[in-house]
Structure formats: C-alpha cells, structure tokens
C-alpha cells in the first residue's frame, strides 16, 4: 500500500478554505497512491461551541460529497476529519472514503481532549475497521492514541494498519510520536500518524507526521512540514508475528487487582490477577 501523509495547515472554522486545500492535495497526489491521510478535523479545524452551527456537517453534506467525488476521480482512498452533526449532537469524526467514493468507515473520537473537545463534542463509543488495498484499516483521532486500549480494540478487530488523524500542538508533539511507535509494536501492525502544521487560535502545530512498521521502526517522517509518502508491505506484519503473537499470548483480559494492607491501612502488596 502506498500512503500519502498529507499534513497541511488548517484554517479553524473555514470549511471552504480547507476543502479547497484538500481537493488540491487529492488531485495532485501521485497516480499510484492508494490512500491519502489528512489530520484531525481537516474540514472544520477546531470549532468553538458557537461555531458548530456554521462548520458542522452531516455525512451527506456537500463538502463531504465533493471529497467522495475527488476520491473516485483520482481512484484513491481518503481519510479525513470534520465536525459531524447527528442526533442534535456534535462529534469529532473521521471518515475513510474508498477509491470508489463510498464511505467505508466512520469513527467518532472516543477520548476527548480537555482544551479543544470538552464542551464542544460528544464522545464516540465504537471502533471499526474496513479493507483498503488489501489491508484492514482502523482509525483513531489524536488523544485516542495515548490510551493503549484504543489501538488494542482495533487490533482485536484484526486491523493491519492504524491511522491516527492528529491535531497535536506544541509542546506535546513528541508525545504522539512515542505513542504511535508503541502502539504499532504492541499490536504488531502498521501505524500512520498525520498531524496538522501551522498556527491556529493561539496554538502551534508541529506536524512531525510519521509511518511506523509492526516492529516499531520509523519508515518515513516529515521533518520539513511537507507531505511524505510511505509504502507498507504486508509481509512485515507476518514477519513481526512469526515467533510470537501478542494477541495470542496475552493473559490479562481483563486484569483484576488484589491489595494486601496492614492494620494501619498501608498497602503492602499489589498483585495482578490474570482474568
């Protein structure tokens, strides 16, 4: 699979500007690109509560349809984020459109970041995977990647590749780079993180997008703010699982905790009990 890590600046609450930049990136992608991955809330940026009515979209909104049309015309799958309106609520949502222009996967961010998500979005509650270019692909959004359980949930759905649509700001940029390497190793799958760049609402976004193989090796990373390409080979997944498989060999599902205390209430021992 050939992936374009399409990190780019995002104009908060300016859907038309962001859509134009996305369409240009899709149309000008190399012809052999299988999947283009954009950052978190690509279309909307980070809206305030008052801006939701202006930038919020349903999955049938015109900007979404235009991206579907561009994916179909370019014969390329596209993963992107937006502010979704549904059932009277707003969600920080990612969509994966396949090369035919069909919405193959929709994911709502499950772990909301206090500064930009709380009070604006409702949290999602489900994980999903779909097949793109012969790989099973799942999606996470930004803060999600800091919780091992999120990536493990996708691995339990047999994900070969975890995409992270990121909107991580300074000074936290390195946190997600470390996390995505760990998640790839823990689940013996590929992981691709795409972060936004530039400034927005007093925040600075460093980019530092990266693709990681199932051994935790960095395949490509962006060091100059420009998009980069990665080629993922399925054989690497099988190689990483040849001698051991974490999903098969794990015991703690779930883990129980047993504490031993003295008479004055001090904890003496903590034992982890495999479920």
What do the predicted segments below correspond to?
Residues 85-157, 169-178, 182, 239-248:
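Active-site catalytic loop in hydrolytic enzyme cores
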Residues 2, 31-32, 136, 158:
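Short loop/turn motifs at secondary-structure junctions
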Residues 15, 19, 23-100, 106, ...:
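Cys-nucleophile CN-hydrolase/nitrilase-fold catalytic domain and related Cys-dependent amidase chemistry
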Residues 4, 95-97, 105, 210, ...:
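Conserved hydrophobic/aromatic positions in well-ordered beta-strands
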């Amino acid at each position: 699979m050939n992936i374009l890590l399409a990190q780019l600046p995002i104009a908060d609450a300016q859907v038309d500007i962001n859509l134009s930049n996305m369409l240009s990136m899709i149309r000008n992608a190399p012809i052999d690109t299988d999947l283009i991955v954009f950052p978190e809330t690509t279309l909307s940026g980070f809206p305030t509560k008052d801006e939701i009515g202006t930038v919020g979209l349903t999955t049938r909104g015109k900007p979404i349809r235009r991206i579907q049309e561009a994916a179909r015309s370019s014969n390329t799958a596209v993963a992107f984020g937006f502010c979704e309106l549904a059932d009277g609520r707003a969600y920080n949502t990612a969509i994966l459109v396949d090369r035919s222009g069909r919405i193959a996967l929709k994911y709502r961010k499950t772990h909301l970041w206090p500064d930009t998500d709380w009070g604006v979005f409702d949290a999602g509650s489900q994980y999903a995977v779909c097949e793109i270019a012969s790989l099973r692909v799942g999606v996470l959004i930004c803060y999600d990647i800091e919780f091992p359980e999120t990536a493990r949930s996708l691995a339990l759905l047999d994900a070969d590749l975890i995409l992270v649509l990121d909107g991580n700001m300074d000074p936290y940029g390195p946190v997600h780079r470390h996390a995505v390497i760990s998640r790839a190793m823990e689940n013996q799958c590929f992981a691709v993180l795409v972060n936004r760049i530039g400034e927005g609402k007093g925040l600075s976004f460093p980019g530092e997008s990266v693709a990681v193989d199932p051994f935790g090796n960095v395949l490509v990373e962006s060091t100059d703010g420009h998009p980069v390409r990665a080629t993922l080979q399925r054989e690497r997944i099988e190689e990483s699982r040849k001698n051991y498989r974490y999903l098969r060999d794990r015991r703690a599902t779930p883990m129980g905790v047993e504490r031993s205390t003295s008479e004055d209430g001090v904890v003496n021992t903590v034992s982890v009990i495999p479920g």
